[in-house]
Design a protein with these regions (language model features):
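Ubiquitin-like/PB1-type beta-grasp interaction modules and other compact soluble beta-rich domains
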Residues: 1-62, 66-67, 71-84, 95, ...
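Auxiliary tRNA-acceptor-end handling modules of aminoacyl-tRNA synthetases
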Residues: 35-54, 77-188
Length: 188
């Protein structure tokens, strides 16, 4: 099998305004560009300006904030609140006040460094160990009810998140965003 990302070659040089491919439908199923595919698969590229592409963009931004939060506040638990227009509201579990400047600097540096969003498969025990260590109680409950032998996670640096939908293959595409304090939490 081959990785879709290798088929695209120069894709990482494209920017936000180039409407690059950001995911693919492989044999009828939406997949990340890092997904390994069978040799004879039917592939339809998904572009950034499509509905699915915009969803991947927003989900990648959310994961980037989660990554920045683990760098700035390794002992805090970031909670995803609700959507607010085109943005998302986040807060910390114990209502700690965020330092928006520190979070934004980490996010900007990750984009500047073009960190890769990797896909990683963890055994059930590895996944449970990670979510327990990070005090992700809801994710822990979910993994225990699914009872799978392995789970797919997205990774940026040391930050992991269960993979539900494709994310952008590269943070360099995150050109249009902002973060601000709102209601004691964070608006992304």
């Amino acid at each position: 099998s081959a990785r879709i990302v290798y088929l695209l070659g120069k894709q990482r040089k494209l920017g936000y305004h180039d409407n690059p491919p950001v995911a693919a439908v492989v044999n009828g199923e939406l997949k990340s560009l890092q997904t390994e595919i069978p040799e004879n698969a039917v592939i339809d590229l998904v572009y950034l300006n499509s509905k699915e592409g915009r969803t991947a963009y927003r989900k990648t931004l959310c994961f980037l904030l989660s990554y920045a939060s683990t760098v700035v506040y390794p002992d805090r638990t970031l909670l995803v609140g609700h959507s607010l227009g085109d943005g998302y509201y986040f807060s910390y579990k114990n209502k700690e006040k965020p330092d928006i400047d520190k979070l934004k600097k980490v996010m900007e540096k990750a984009i500047e460094d073009d960190l890769i969003v990797d896909i990683e498969t963890l055994s059930a025990s590895q996944a449970l160990t990670y979510v327990e260590k990070m005090k992700l109680k809801d994710t822990e409950k979910l993994l225990k009810t699914r009872n799978d032998g392995a789970y797919t996670f997205n990774r940026i640096g040391s930050a992991l998140s269960v993979s539900y939908e494709p994310l952008l293959p590269s943070l360099k595409l995150l050109e249009v965003w902002d973060i601000m304090e709102y209601g004691g939490g964070i608006l992304l």
